[in-house]
Structure formats: C-alpha cells, structure tokens
C-alpha cells in the first residue's frame, strides 16, 4: 500500500483544485520559504484526521481556507493504491470542511461513502496508519520529543505497546470490583448482625430446648415415680408379712436345737479326753523314726536302679555296634571269595585268548604265502583286466562329464520352466496389488494431513497454555515481591507502634508490668483504643488514671504493692476486677453539642468494663466549651479542645503541651495499616488462587504435551506407513520391470538350453555303446576260475587280519581287569583286619559290662532286704495305733463341729429377734405410706424394666434442680434462631459467591497488569534495540533508552542516553541542538521500525542538522525507502540528491501554491 494521489481544493495556500500524483520510493518536496510546501503535509493530516487545526498551524478552522476567507469550503482527497495481499484496488479518503462565520461542518468519506472519524481511523489502523503513530513527522515533533517530559516520552512507548487498552480493561475490572465490594460489604454487615443475633439466640435456643425437654421428662418421671412407689410398697408389705410368720417358726426351732447341742458337747469332750490318753500309751514316736529310715533306704535303691538302667542302655548300644561290625565282616568275606573266583576266571581267559591269538597268527601267515603263489600264476590275466579297466575308465571319463552336463541342462530347463511360471504368477499378483496400494496410499495421505492438523492444533494449544503459565508465573513473582515488601513495611510500622506502647507508664507501672505476676492485665491506656479525633479529650478526662493498673483481683494488687515496696519503685493505683462494680446506667443524651459518653467512644474488652467505669464514670464529651458551659453542674464534661468541667463547677483549661513519650490511649489502627492488611489478605488469596490455577494449567500443559507427543508418534507412524507404501509401490514397480526382463531373457535361455541338450544327446549315444562293449569283455574275463580264487584269497586274508587285531584288543582288556581285581582284593583285606581288631575290643568291654551289672544287682538285693525289714516293723506298729488314732480324730472333729454350730445358733437367734422387731416397724410404715399415695393412674406408660425407684428419684431430683437453674427462659428463641440461621446461610452463600467474583476480578486485574508490563517491556526492548542500531548509524556513536524506574516502568519516565563519537555519555538535556535532533530522529525511526507503516511524511526534520548529519539522514531515508514510501519536505541538497524524484512548490501570481514535478537523474537512470 502506498500514497497514489493527493487532491487539494482551496486548502490553505492552494487554489481551486490541485492534483499531486505520488509514486513509491523516496519523494522530496522542496521550494522557497512560504511557498506552501509544508501545506502538502498539512493537507494529508487534514484528510486522514491525524491532527487538530492547531497541529496544522492554524488557530481556527477558518485559517484552513484559502487566503483565510470567513466563508468557503475545503476538500482534500487522498488515494491509496492497495497491495495484492489486501485485495488490490484503491482506497479513497475525502474530507470536506464548510465554514460559515463562526459555524463549521466537517465530513469524511471512505471510498465515496460517508463515515465517522472513528470508522476512518479503524480502517486506517487495518493498514497500519495510526493517529498516535509517527507516520507524519512535523517540524515541531523532533523538538517536541526533546522538550517533552520523560513521562510523556515513556507514554509514546505505552501507545505503541497498547497500554491504553490494558488500562481500559483494568479500569473496567476495577469498576466491577468496586460494585462487587459494595454489595459484599452490604451483605457482610447484614451477616455480621445476623451472626451476633444467632450467637445470642443460640444460647437462648439451647436453653429453651433443654427447658422444654426437662419439663416433659419431669412429668413422665413423676408418673413413673408414683407407680413404682405403689408397686414397691405393696411388694414390701407382702414380703414383710411372710417374713414375720416364717421368723417365728425359725426362732422356736433355734431354741430346741440349742438345748440338744449343749448336752452333745459335754459328751463329746469326755470321749476325746479318753482317746488322747490311749494314743500316747501306744508309742507314736517310734513309728515316725522307722518311717524316716525306710525313706532314706528307698532313695538309695532308686539311685542304684537308675545306674543299672544306664548300664543296660550302654550294653544295648555296644551290642548294636557289634552286630553292625559282624555284618561288615561277613560282607568282606563274601567279597574276598568273589575276588578269588574272578581272578581265576580272568587268568583262564587270558591263557585261552593268548593260545587263540597264536593260532590265528599262524593261519594268517599261511594265507599270505598262498596268496603270493596265486598272484604269480595269474599275472597275465591281471594285465588283461587292467587294460580293460583303463579303457573303461577312459570312456567313462568322456561319458560322465557329458552326462552331467546333460543332467544339469535338464534340471536347469525344469527349474527355469518352474521359475518362469512362479515369476508370471508373481507379476500377476503385483499388477493386481497396484490398485490396492494406490488406495492405501491415498488413505495414508489423508490420515497424514489430519494428523498434521491435529499436531499443529495441539502444539498451538500447548504454546498458548505455556504462554498463560509464563504470564501467571510472572504475576505470581510480582505479587510475591509485593507481598514481601508490604509484609516488611507492616512489620516495621507495627514494631514502631509496639515500641511506643512499651514506653508508656511510670517506673512503678513498668516494674509491675515487667514482673510477670499472674493476673496483671495492663494499664488503662493499653487496654483501650480511641479514634484520633477523640484522643486528646479522653486523655484529659482520664488524667493520671490512664496509668492505673488493671488486675484480676485484690490479691494480685496486694502482691504488686509488696513488689513495689521491696524494690522501692514508687507507687501505683490498682483496679482489681473482682471488687469493682461492673454495672452502669447512663441516661440518653439530648443536649446540644454532646457527642456522647466517654465510655461509648472507647473500644475495650467487655471484661474490663468495670475498670473503665471507675476511670471515666459518666463523663460526657462536648464539641466546644461554649456548649458545655450550658450544662455546667449537671455532668462531668470534657471538650474536644481539652477543657475539663466538673460537676462541682470547677473548670480546667488552657494550652495543651505536646505529648512526648507520655502515656496515652492507643489510636485506632491508621487507615494505611488497615489498607496494608487488606492488601496482604488480597495478595494471599490471589497467590493461593494463582497457585491453584498454575497447577491446573501445568496439568493441562502436561496433558497437551502428552497429546502432542502422542500426535507426533502417530504422525511419525503414519509418515512411516506412507513412506512404506511408497517404497512398496516403487519396489513392486521395479520388481515388475525386473520380472518382465527376466521372463524375456529366460525364454531366450530356454531355447539355447534345449538346443544344447539335443547336441549332447547325439554325442552320448556312441560313447554309451563303447562302454557297454568294454564292460561285457571285462565281465567275461572276470568270470574265469583264477580270478575267482584270487578274490576269495584276498577276502580271507583281510578277515584273518581283522580277527587277529580283535583278539589282541580283548587280551589287553583282560589283563587290565585282572590287575584291578588284585588291587581291590588288597584293600578289602586291610579293611577286614581293622574290623577284627574292633571286635576284640568289644569282647573286653562286654566282660566289663557284666561285672558292673552283677555289682548293681547285688546292691539292689541288699536294699530290698533292708526295706522289707523296716516295712515289717512299721506295719506291726500301725496295726496297733491305727484304730485308736482314727477314733481320736473323729471325736476331736465332732467336738469342734458341735461347738461351732452352738455359737452360730446363738448368733442367728439374736439376729433373727432383732430383724423381727425391724420388720414389724417397717410393715407399719409401709402401710401408712401406701394409704397416703393412693392408687396409680390407669393411663401411665410403663417404665423401663431395669429402672429402680431409687434411680428414678435421683434422676428426677437432678432434673428438677437443672430446670430451676435455667429459669427465666425465652421459648420463642427456637423459631427465631431457625429463621435467622436460614437467612444467614442464604446471605453467606451470596457472600461466598461475591468473594469468588472479587478474587477473580483481582486476579484479572493482576493478569492485565502483568500482560501490560510484558507488552510494554517487549515494545521497549524492541524500540531500544532499533534505537541503538539507528543512533550508531546516524551519529557514529552509541546510545540507548533508559527507564527512570526499571522495576516499575509506569511510575517513571523515559530518558534518551547518547554517546556521540568523541564525547562523553550524555543525557538528552545536556546535548547540543544538532545532537538532540539526531537523537530524537533516531528515536522516531526506532518507533517507525517497531510499528512499520506503508508511508511516512517528514516536514523539514533536517532543518537543525549540519551538512554531514543531513547526508547521514538522507542515506538512512534512502535505505528505508526501498521498502516504504517516503514523502519528505526539505530544502537541503543532500536530501534532494538522494531522492528518487522531487516535487517543486512555488507561489503563483494569483497567490496560491503551484506544484511542479521534477524527475531526478537517479530516477532517470
């Protein structure tokens, strides 16, 4: 796209109609000063709407009319030639201005159709022509860049990067965020109120539900108690009555049994004394000694039996070893006997084979002598046979090669015929498979195109997701940095506030606060917060009582006082919470100027209310002294200015000294701290949301990466398949061609082989006849008797030689076996001698075992004899004592049983008499209680079976006490709580939704800010790169763009830093006029290179440059004109010489500008 034509009607210095054709390349407009050459540029700006009238060097619109007429019409038409990529053709823009005194109308047309300026700018933007761009550079634009503030210079980059669009989106999101926050705050306030109401109703509701439940339970328990009481009393009366009757019978039986037991006890004692006397007389001590002796002997006998058993076990083990030894000796005897027999047999066999071998050797020698005699007599016959054999071999040597050749030809013909058939079948299959391969190749190409599309789409999605991840990570890093800075600043401010608070109070109060005494809460000034506007008034109202120390109880106060005494730290006033009156009643204030009670203007914990009442009482805060004086004597008052008016009429006032380190109320948290905390909360939520979104996007990117890899593998597989199909098709084509050539050559070869086969058959016929004839003659010769005998002799000689070699081998094997047998026999004899030695040892051991056994049995017999004698003595004594002792033991046990029973009987009789009196009293009381209760109600539900009356009464008493403790009760709280909870739940859901929307909007704002920064830095880096190369080309120096605040570029401006050749590095403000122009032009060219346009127009931008710099500028324009159209207004020779063509502008006699075209030499050549 380029400017094709400019048509001007009555615009500034131009007359009724002027048409200026324009061509691509580099065009210079030149002419005398005041001739109107710059008006061509102004006309271009006017038509395209790229500047205001002031930008076109006109104070008002009427100045744009030819010769400044008050009335008239101006029209400028610009025609663009479109490129083929844009559809070709032309784009025509026309602007008309009608001025009628103070009134004027301006209209635009686009390709002959009316349009608005916005429509025109949108159409021009599609062709990279922007109102804020640098398509047209006027005389003041270069100096404007030099003079403009750094922030405005940075805003040029903002325009290029599209920052305004991001700002618009951010502003829209912030407006929406404000609306969301307003709705959220409104709902939050309602929810807070509902939560406070629910907290109150929750307690009342639980109390009411418990009260209602207890009343129902108590009613039911009362009915059960009456029923169980009646049942219990009736059962008790029946039981006591039966017990009284049974007890009378039991008491009578006890009396009778006691008399009988007394008589039996006396009789049993007499009998026991008689039995004891008899036992002592019979010798019980002697029997005990005999039994002890017998037990000792029995123990010794048991030891002897154990030793005998051990000996028997050893004998059995030794006998087992002896039996095993005898078995081994028997086996060895049999083995040795076998060795003897085997050796005899082997010796006989060796002798037999030796004799046979000698005999066969003699026969062999005889046969050899006979064969030599037979060979001497048959020599002539052998010579004839040899000649025939040689003749036969010669014929056979001629015949066999020819026959083999003939056989090979036959085989080759058969093989070639078979191969030809197979190749014809293969060629038919290949030709039939061509169509299928073509279809498969087409399908493979379609699949390949689809796979490439899927892969490109997946990669595009992956790149987009990665770009989003990169943007999110950038936002995350920026927010984390901001959070760190905010948290550090917040910590610093809070530390300052804490240090200030810790410095409050006197030495005495500081000693108490730092002592660590349990129950010390703090100073009044530390336990309350006030707003800044009320701080002075409230501190005057409290006075020195701000340093009063609030403690848990009077014991803590006493402990603190003793501490101050011991440390001589001074005095302090303590406010024990357990002794202060916590109630307060303050009348409603209606007096003019009264702000409120001091207590209502302080924020404090409700548990410290009594302490703050003690300090402030009913003090009222008034706006001014004048208004407070009207109420003097009615209230204790303090004014906002710090005057104090007592009820007694005393007034205190004057100037207030600035507080320097003294104690005072803590101010409510400053707004900047609250905003900082809120921002930190927002940052935490945004970072959490960003982390979740990053996780989701990374998971999505991972899935897309896997999908891309799968698509890549699929694409590779399809490409491989397509290539394989192509290779198969090419291979089959080559194979078909090869088969056709082979079949043709095979046919020729078959014909030649058949001819050669016929020739060989003709040559073989005579040879076969000669071979048959020679064989017949040889057969006749070999049928003679001499030949037969000679053959038999040779055969017999070979058999004898074989037999002799076989017998020699057998003889060597037999001798080896005999030697091995002798060796085995020697080993067996050695083992037998060892076993015989062990058998002699066992005989000695057996004799020893017999002797030890005899000794053990002798000792056992002696022990048995002693035991028998002792047993006889014990038996004799037992026969005499057993009967008497048995009778004594029986009598003793019987006497003890009678005495025990007598004592138990007396105790039971006394207890039963006591119980009888108790039963009679209980019967009377139960009957009286039953009469008082009366009969139970009929409709009472049955109580649990395992519930006793005592358990029920205890439960009823406990519930009754709980019920009384709950009163009074609001029973309507149950329904009110449910309604409030339902409303709170609905609002909480709405609030959660709004919070999510708020987080999304905040994140959208941060995303836009990140993208805005990224777009700006991308544009800045690109423009900076272009600026460095352009400045180096224009000035032979180096320079760069510098941001005043690189960390936050939008908070500062943009500076041009240049280093002209031979000079130190300078900023724009310190340069000369020419250096400033070159630097500004480099900046303009860098902007143009970043956002290229189809044409550029310069209006005398070289006016402040010297000849050398104009030459460099003209050279640069000449280079860029190769790809972009340039229209330059200039009076400088280097610029004109570098141009492709020139347009001359002069002032005609009629006072309007006249345009002449000049074709330069460069263009002509």
From Swiss-Prot:
Entry's localization field: Cytoplasm
A Gene Ontology biological process term: chromosome segregation
Origin superkingdom: Bacteria
Primary subcellular site in the record, as a coarse category: cytoplasm
Coiled-coil annotated spans: 161-503, 672-901, 946-1010
Pfam families: SMC_hinge, SMC_N
Gene Ontology MF term list: ATP binding; ATP hydrolysis activity; DNA binding
Amino acids binding ATP: 32-39
Keywords tagged on the record: ATP-binding, Coiled coil, Cytoplasm, DNA-binding, Nucleotide-binding
Function per UniProt: Required for chromosome condensation and partitioning.
Domain notes: Contains large globular domains required for ATP hydrolysis at each terminus and a third globular domain forming a flexible SMC hinge near the middle of the molecule. These domains are separated by coiled-coil structures.
Subunit structure: Homodimer.
Record NCBIfam families: SMC_prok_A (TIGR02169), SMC_prok_B (TIGR02168)
Family as reported in the entry's similarity comment: Belongs to the SMC family.
Protein name, as recorded: Chromosome partition protein Smc
Organism: Gloeobacter violaceus (strain ATCC 29082 / PCC 7421)
Gene: smc
